[in-house]
Design a protein with these regions (language model features):
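A short core secondary-structure module
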Residues: 152-196
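A generic local secondary-structure boundary/capping motif
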Residues: 112-114, 130-131, 139-141, 155-159, ...
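Flexible, small-/acidic-enriched active-site or ligand-binding loops
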Residues: 137-143, 157, 190-226
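Alpha-helical interface subdomain recognition
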Residues: 1-84, 103-107, 115, 119, ...
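Cytochrome P450 C-terminal beta-domain/meander region
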Residues: 134-152
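A short, Trp-centered hydrophobic/proline-enriched beta-strand micro-motif
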Residues: 119-130
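A generic structural signal for well-ordered coil/turn residues at beta-strand boundaries
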Residues: 96, 119-121, 136-138, 163-165, ...
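N-terminal glycine-rich flavin-associated loop
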Residues: 85-107
Length: 380
């Protein structure tokens, strides 16, 4: 497996960096945080991303997209982490597209994928029902009623739920035959359908998630996404895709936190010398650098595995998420330590990276969850 970027992938990484240097970053995030009317992301920034074609990258050409590689999109997510950009790109442009592409419901593919490519719709995917990620706990029910269905249940920590035009909800549905266990299904519902209530939550990194309550929401059979493999398999692959892209974001966070810390070590003086000359700090910095370099290879391996549809993708995804979560945690924690008390102030950027790292680590399972998942998938 080639773990080096090709020319196109390098170009998209550089272009994403150049764009986000000018249009995102801690100062922009601070302004977003202080705006009482904020949606948790910048509509202006999202509009510029649409103009650059980012939401269309993974969309097949037949639906107006560019059909680009996961590793190419992964370079953008890495830069998103570097510059703390907030947008619906992960959920709509990556996970929504990935799920619809794998579906055999041609109606929904033809209806939604072109809208995503054009930046004309936003989606949210409602999975978790507990405060910590546990996709095995699904109590939301899709129950047959009068020739249709009704959807009832509660979903927590729904990213982009506050701005979504539609939700893809993971729910339990009765088995096709009597006494068969319930199966899981993916249901598309409009955010304006009757019976849906949305409560928004502010995260420590200034982004937002939502709690969704579904009360007798009417659903037709057409709204249930169909697949050519089991829904459980589709869900696990979707979560693996999410965690690989979060690994790319966490790597970007770690890289920038390390860069900020090195800049501080080279400028802060104590006892008449730059603190970067202290051997103890040099050793800690060297360890961080080595870990980040390892993280780069891990993320490239995971993204390549997505493109090549590796049979071990679930295990690879969990290994990547577990490792990059620890790398980002160490990079931001060490960054705060090496900055000293001033690192905790709002004036310095390192605290923003610490907060983003904490949130991204927890989304779709923290490092402990993914160590367990990787071990289980390895036969332990």
């Amino acid at each position: 497996m080639n773990l080096v970027l090709n020319e196109e992938e390098t170009m998209i990484k550089d272009a994403a960096n150049d764009f986000l240097v000018e249009n995102a970053g801690p100062d922009h995030l601070r302004n977003l945080r202080d705006d009482p009317d904020s949606k948790g992301f910048s509509e202006s920034l999202w509009g510029q991303m649409i103009d650059l074609g980012w939401p269309s990258l993974l969309v097949p050409e037949e639906f107006g997209g560019l059909d680009f590689s996961h590793i190419g999109m992964g370079q953008i997510m890495q830069q998103v982490g570097c510059h703390l950009a907030t947008s619906p790109l992960l959920i709509t442009g990556i996970l929504g597209v990935t799920l619809l592409k794998s579906s055999s419901s041609n109606h929904w593919k033809a209806k939604i994928l072109p809208l995503i490519a054009q930046g004309k719709t936003k989606m949210a995917i409602a999975i978790d029902e507990t405060s910590r990620h546990d996709p095995q706990v699904i109590q939301t029910k899709l129950t047959p009623k009068a020739g249709e269905y009704v959807l009832n249940g509660t979903k927590l920590n729904v990213v982009d739920g506050q701005v979504a035009d539609s939700f893809i909800v993971i729910a339990k549905i009765p088995g096709e035959k009597p006494k068969e266990p319930d199966d899981i299904c993916f249901v598309i519902v409009g955010s304006n359908q009757k019976g849906i209530s949305v409560k928004n939550n502010l995260l420590i990194d200034s982004r937002k998630t939502s709690s969704l309550i579904f009360s007798d929401v009417k659903v037709t059979d057409k709204q249930i996404l169909k697949f050519n493999e089991s829904s459980e398999s589709i869900l696990q692959k979707l979560l693996s895709t999410a965690n690989i892209y979060l690994s790319a974001e966490l790597l970007g966070i770690a890289e920038k936190a390390f860069e900020l810390t090195m800049q501080y070590l080279k400028t802060r003086s104590q006892f008449g010398v730059k603190i970067g000359s202290f051997q103890a700090l040099q050793h800690r910095a060297a360890n961080l650098w080595a870990e980040i370099e390892l993280g780069k290879s891990i993320v490239l391996k995971a993204l390549r595995s997505l493109d090549e549809i590796d049979k071990d993708i679930n295990k690879i995804a969990s290994m990547a998420k577990a490792k990059t979560s620890k790398i980002a945690e160490n990079a931001t924690n060490e960054g705060i330590q090496m900055h000293g008390g001033i690192g905790m102030t709002d004036e310095f950027y390192i605290g923003f990276y610490l907060k983003r790292a904490k949130v991204s680590q927890m989304l779709f399972g923290d490092w402990k969850y993914h160590l367990d998942r990787a071990a289980y998938l390895s036969g332990y």
